[in-house]
Design a protein with these regions (language model features):
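ATP/NTP-dependent adenylation/nucleotidyl-transfer catalytic domains that generate, transfer
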Residues: 1-22, 27-291
Length: 291
């Protein structure tokens, strides 16, 4: 993923990246990868808190930016959200998605005004289930972790911190441009990704008390089903024979099938698994064939 981002930026003449920093694990890992690829000084992290953002998430975003030496700006979205709501008076999912789309506008404003590559931070589990906001958190020109399941995101984040603890600084990965294995720029306290970003329950923080598990099966289970359904092409009967319960199988298959239209519009990114969305797996956008 780091090499893919580094190579894409070099071949398309991008010197830096911008992304939203929510304090969550996905944006933290993507920012860390960007720092390893082009240096923290070329990463522009934007915190865009709302009335639902926790103090812990704000602190985690700031800690991540400080750890990797990134530029860090805070752009609260509540004034913009209130302006939209004064005219639109949205409720429910529409109001939640409005927050994500305001953030997307801000990220793209940084990209356009500073000549930066906007990077999307969605993972494969979210893309599979359509757990993203089109024209919101799905904006960008490149998506470094789009082929990593959520459980893999956690695994890589823990590995990167372990590597940092034993001296692998920013840019210390053995990739093109660092073939000799320079240790890179030392990290403060030997930590790259805030531990709290790794350990806390995932949440989009678009409404009070929201958790990913409100809308999706727990990731430990979800990713097992997704791996068999997507990467091993197991159908419904196969998944049931694999030991997954009927309700979970039907829910996951329905979510995946209905989200094809979103995946068609998602930014490109590296292929790191046996079967990635896009060229490897293209199903019809219309999905009534399941019925």
């Amino acid at each position: 993923c780091v090499l893919g981002l580094k190579d894409y930026m070099a071949k398309n003449h991008f010197k830096g990246v911008c992304l939203g920093l929510s304090g969550g694990i996905d944006s933290a890992l993507v920012a860390a990868m960007a720092a390893d690829a082009v240096g923290g000084e070329n990463v522009y992290g934007i915190s865009m808190p709302s009335m639902y953002s926790s103090d812990g998430s704000k602190d985690d975003a700031a800690d991540l930016a400080r750890n990797i030496g990134a530029h860090y700006d805070i752009q609260p979205i509540e004034p913009l959200f209130v302006s939209f709501q004064n005219q639109l008076e949205l409720e429910g999912v529409a109001a939640e998605n409005l927050q994500a789309r305001i953030r997307g506008v801000i990220v793209m404003a940084y990209s356009n005004s500073k000549g930066l590559l906007a990077v999307a931070t969605g993972n494969k589990s979210e893309l599979a289930c359509g757990y993203s906001t089109i024209y919101g958190d799905a904006v960008g020109g490149y998506a470094p972790i789009k082929d990593l399941l959520k459980t893999r995101v956690w695994e890589i984040s823990r590995w990167r911190n372990k590597a940092a603890a034993v001296g692998m600084g920013i840019g210390g990965l053995h990739v093109v441009g660092n073939e000799q294995g320079s240790a890179g720029t030392p990290l403060p306290d030997g930590v790259m990704i805030p531990v709290n970003s790794i350990e806390k329950a995932p949440s989009a923080e678009l409404r009070p008390g929201q958790k990913d598990s409100d809308s999706l099966p727990e990731y430990a289970l979800l990713d097992q089903v997704l791996a068999m359904y997507i990467e091993h092409a197991h159908g419904r009967a196969d998944l049931l024979a694999d030991g997954f319960d009927e309700a979970t199988v039907d829910t996951v298959m329905r979510l995946v099938d209905r989200a094809e239209w979103k995946r068609r519009q998602y930014p490109l990114g590296p292929k790191v698994t046996a079967l990635a969305f896009g060229r490897d797996r293209r199903l019809p956008v219309t999905n009534a064939f399941r019925e």
